[in-house]
Amino acid sequence: MGNCNEYTALKIGALLHDIGKFIQRASDKPKSKGHDKFGYEFLKEKFKNGFLNHLDEKTKDKILEIVKEHHNQKIKDDLIGIVRLADWLSSGERREPKGDPENVEVLNTEEQKLLSIFETVCIGELTENLYKNGFKYSLKPLNVSDAIFTDKPYPNENYKELFSKFEDEIKDFKGDVSFEELYQLMQKYTWCIPSVTMWKKAGSLKGGLPDVSLFDHSKTTCAIACCLYQMYVKENKKKNKYAKEYIDDKTLEKLFNNDNGWNKEIFSLIHGDLSGIQDFVFTITTKYATKSLKGRSFYLDFLTEYFAKYICKELNLPITNILFYGGGHFYILSYKVDENLINKLEKEINEVLFNMFRTKIYITIAEVGVTPNDFKKSEDKESKEKTWGFAKKWKEVSEKTVEKKLRRFEYKLEGLFEPYNRGSENRCVICRNEFDKNEKGYAIRENESKSERICDYCASFVALTDILKNFQMEKTIKFNKAYPIIHLTKNKDNLSLQREEFSFLTVKAIEKLESKFRVLSDENYFLKEYKLPHDSGELIIPYKIWAIAFPIIENETEKRILDFDGLAEKAFERTGTRKIGILKMDVDNLGEIFTTGLGNDATISRMSTLSSMLTLFFTGYIPHLIKNEEFEVNGKKYKFKDNIYLVYAGGDDTLIVGAWDAVWELAKRIRGDFKKFVCYNPYITLSAGIVFVNPKFEFKKAVNMAEEELENGKNYIIYEDEETEKKVDKNALTVFNCPMNWDLEVEYNEYCWTKLKSYLEGINKEMVELESLVKKFNEDDLEKNLKKQLKRQIRKESYI
């Protein structure tokens, strides 16, 4: 965790500042004292028993002081003042919250459950009945299976059972425990605990309804506190050279007294956007697609995490300050930095990427200033503005990145037009790029007697794919462990030679990054080993939730990933049709959900909760589903894991390849589970596009076809009332250029119809008639028709 110093105490103290809320709710006498005292006494005892015993006594004392005094209104300076202010800002307040006893709802301990954040998205005015009837999470340690789903207004689990598991695990937190492990301990056990349990019956108090987890509140409090500390100046404390603004004890006091400073930009919200993803991942020959496809898609997702952590490293901020990463984007909360620094970091990263991949990959980084007022919830109920608070800044920095992206490579325009290729026919068989003059490349084995030559970077992605396969089988990530890569050798003429060995750190595409940025070697940002989620979905600290799911076949000599021909053959054995399916899915209107969906309660902690939950579904649950669930064809069950190749899942979307019938069944399963995951909220929907092709069909073209099908679904409008401006659109499955609304045309879901009608008041006669038609609709009939249509399509397009 680094040297035991004031900054270490601040990070840990801020992360654990509200741990007493957990202990209090598990106590037999929860009203005997405040949560701050519960937390103080708990940590004091644990420190005596060896918890975090690598810290010195002064650091432990400072942590205890922060936990005990962070609500002390008399203390407005130093670390306690910083954490106290961060606590306010995380909650969207600018004062210590106080409730009118006659107008405040306070839950009994056994009733204090976390309302799903999805229950509050796009619903307008919060209501008292929303908490009463809304779905809440069970009190279970975080996993990637059942814990993240809820369909219960009143889960039965109690705090004592959860706290007992927490205490058992904390016994292992002795020795040199990393900050990331402590962060994961909080995530695992406090993700399902509400950070507040009281609110005004009319209006809101400290964040409105209890839909923000204690983990996300603690994470964002820590992030804000670290920003404030990096700006904080006092005697014997060295100034941060990157901070554009500075604060001292007088500044803190003025902020607490609401004197001034609330409109001063002392924070930055930084957004990174990786370009070129589609072309980079899919511009490969189909022949070796399965050998390098996952390595390529994983690499780009890894770059998003890697560069977010690199920026945090440069700014001396912990991982808590990464508010979101996935899908080629990241958002970081920072102290106010100069735009020239952002441009410098952007140029520095792009120089390395350009030297590796020329213009194929580019990162755009932008920042906007954030004031303390921007953390506040809006108190203007009459405002016509659709975007409030922190969501407004989220939207602003995203738009700035889009505008900046139009000027990419402007710093080196001359270099772009310099001669690069030599016109040689000596090219890599995977990416079709010329070999560099002195590049020897690698031989990739096609079969036991034949091989072809590939470039060093394609060899990296072949190696990464195989390394990820080994991670999946071992359920452990070991960055230093070397694996023999069964397809690769340096000698093209002797295929019997021992295969090349690579570790995650020694593949060229990773090695080049590390030689410049040194992020993987910094324990503040990456550990040497992680556990992948267990088959049960359990998360074992330290864990890494990476979306890995390969169809693996095993013979006497090797375990290899099934290729597209093998996947098509599996479908042929079941259906008589030798095709693969390509599925693209993503969340509809995600930008609007983030920028307007939370209304005037769009606090930083609420947005953190929303983003982390969506990431859990795509990055955690979808791989778990593929590796553990089955589908049925003609009365016989088959495993998804033997039929599905997960190319990508993260952020808000997924790309999947597999046996065509398995892909069809998986699309329905993912969508059904997603609907349950978001508590059947009709404003949070998922669209999908599927294509069925020959396994040797050009892969990039097939992906583009799936993308077109997805877009057809997103443009699909099944019902629109121009007078009321209400419509039912998107939320569609598209196949054979035919979009179908999931709820209205693919299957009848009574609960969804009931909820839909409750949102669309004054529903007209046509919608009522449509519901009756959908009730009579049978999905089995649809599948039969689709299979007939598929056979006609195959005959029509037999050239594929």
UniProtKB/Swiss-Prot annotation:
One of its GO terms (molecular function) is transferase activity. It holds the Pfam family Csm1_B. Its EC number is 3.1.-.-, 2.7.7.-. Keywords: Antiviral defense, ATP-binding, Endonuclease, Exonuclease, Hydrolase, Nuclease, Nucleotide-binding, RNA-binding, Transferase. Residues 578-722 form the GGDEF domain. Residues 1-92 form the HD domain. The keyword Nuclease applies. The keyword RNA-binding applies. Its cofactor is a divalent metal cation. GO terms for biological process: defense response to virus. InterPro entries: Cas10-Cmr2_palm2, Cas10/Csm1, Cas10/Csm1_subtype-III-A, Csm1_B, GGDEF_dom, HD_domain, Rev_trsase/Diguanyl_cyclase. It comes from the Archaea. The N-terminal HD domain has ssDNase activity. The C-terminal GGDEF domain has the cOA synthesis activity. Belongs to the CRISPR-associated Cas10/Csm1 family. Encoded in a type III-A CRISPR locus. Part of the Csm effector complex, that includes Cas10/Csm1, Csm2, Csm3, Csm4, Csm5 and mature crRNA. Stable Cas10/Csm1-Csm4 and Cas10-Csm1-Csm3-Csm4 subcomplexes can be isolated; Cas10 and Csm3 probably do not directly interact. NCBIfam families: cas_TM1811_Csm1. CRISPR (clustered regularly interspaced short palindromic repeat) is an adaptive immune system that provides protection against mobile genetic elements (viruses, transposable elements and conjugative plasmids). CRISPR clusters contain spacers, sequences complementary to antecedent mobile elements, and target invading nucleic acids. CRISPR clusters are transcribed and processed into CRISPR RNA (crRNA). This is CRISPR system single-strand-specific deoxyribonuclease Cas10/Csm1 (subtype III-A). The gene is cas10.
